[in-house]
Amino acid sequence: MVESALVDWSRLQFALTAGYHWIFVPLTLGLAVVMATMETIYVINGDEFWKKTAKFWMKLFAINFAVGIATGIILEFEFGTNWSNYSWFVGDIFGAPLAIEGIFAFFMEATFFAVMFFGWEKVGKRFHLASTWFTGIGAAISAVWILVANSWMQHPVGMEFNPDTVRHEMVDFWALVLNPVAVSKFFHSWFSGWMTGAIFVIGISCWYLLRGRERRFALSSIRVASIVGIVGTLLVMFSGDSSAVHVSKYQPMKLAAAEGLEEGGTRAPFSIVPGVEVPGVLSILATHDLDGYVPGINNILDGYTTPEGDVYLSAEEKMERGKTAIEAFGTYRTLKQSDPEAAQEARAVLDENIDYFGYGYIDSREELVPNVPLVYWAFRIMVGFGGLLLCLMFVVLWAERRKRLENMRWLQWASLLSIPLVYIAGQAGWIVAEAGRQPWVIEGLLPTKAAVSSVSVGAVQTTFFLFVAIFTLFLAIEIRILIKAIKEGPKTEIE
């Protein structure tokens, strides 16, 4: 039996390293779009001001990009150190997108990044502009493959279980890539990066206005960033709608936890906060139908039948079928040499129950319910801060276009102080995605407690605190370098 402390510390360590890494990723994705847009303006109109503006944000991009790479490398090693059972069980599938990301996307980023950062006076304007855009595209492609891998864990497709190797093996690469969960998750994450980059640029630009510096630079940056951010946030909402439908279909327990919905039904209400609900809205979000059926936590545990006649087994039935699958697997492995005919009979039983294999490791129905308060409030923080920041960007853009922003110091302060909010919203979104699918590391196939390595709790605790120190140092170094670069400024003023 795996120690619960080992599972908890392994999860905590991965949450720590992934959370730190995600501080840098969305800014890379979003700042790439903002600075590429600025350089495009420079290439079109030839105004050196826009070149200097783009170069300044490019400097901040480079700092963030470098630290993001350093924090990301550690994550991949953790699969082998803390999650070796997981790596063996699905390495054939999970490793493919990670390998593609490392070989193709990273080298694409590195190549064009070098041209972008060092090639201003060495290549033509249009070639340099293309390099800037391709750096951003390369970063987005990196995100594609990472999110394809993550989405497969949320909704496993394109594979089959091989009892001879005790591994899930890929049988359809394109099913993996075009997984509907992966498509919506990529766009949701990418566009949230636009939002992060925009809020960062707006906040820093407002700092210059508060200091009475770099007036034209600040206002021009705010204009571009606000447009990018508004477009990105609206697209985040659109892709989030798509994600809600997929979560409702493939991970109903996650949706029920995010809404604190104990008893489901048709015209299910959307919970704003506990005790404040809007009737029917959850059904619309989850099924695009006011009369759509949304199961609650108890319905999922007890088993339910949809109005369309689809039958879903109870937790106990799934656990029983899972134990049957595990027993048949053991019988097949034992008899495949001595009694091939009996082994094939066991294989048939295994194949019949393989979809519930992971449930055989679950000891009680309570294990199937994630941390409801954590998921519930994380979802509200994500949505609430996202809506607040969208309103802020609309107001900032309106004030800038009306030439009122310079006199609205309260709005400048609000913009500067909003920078932490966009990061909190992003982290909250990942809490919903990852905590909401517990107890599974692979939905329905492999519970988290069966995925950990056979290492001591002390070893994981030691590396956890070591990573806390290292990652905090990375973050402190980046913040210090960013502050120094920001204080130096873009030096675009000629007034």
Positions of PLM-derived features:
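Membrane-interface interhelical loops and short amphipathic "cap" helices
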Residues: M1-G19, G46-T53, F77-A99, S151-F187, ...
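Individual transmembrane alpha-helix segments
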Residues: A15, P180-G193, V278-F385, F464
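Membrane-interfacial loop-to-helix junctions in multi-pass inner-membrane proteins
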Residues: N45-A66, F89-G95, A99, G119-I137, ...
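Hydrophobic alpha-helical membrane-insertion segments
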Residues: A62-T71, W133-M153, G229-G240, Y332-L335, ...
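Membrane-interface helix-loop-helix modules in multi-pass inner-membrane proteins
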Residues: N64-F134, S151, A435-Q438
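C-terminal substrate/ligand-recognition segments
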Residues: E367-W430, Q461-A485
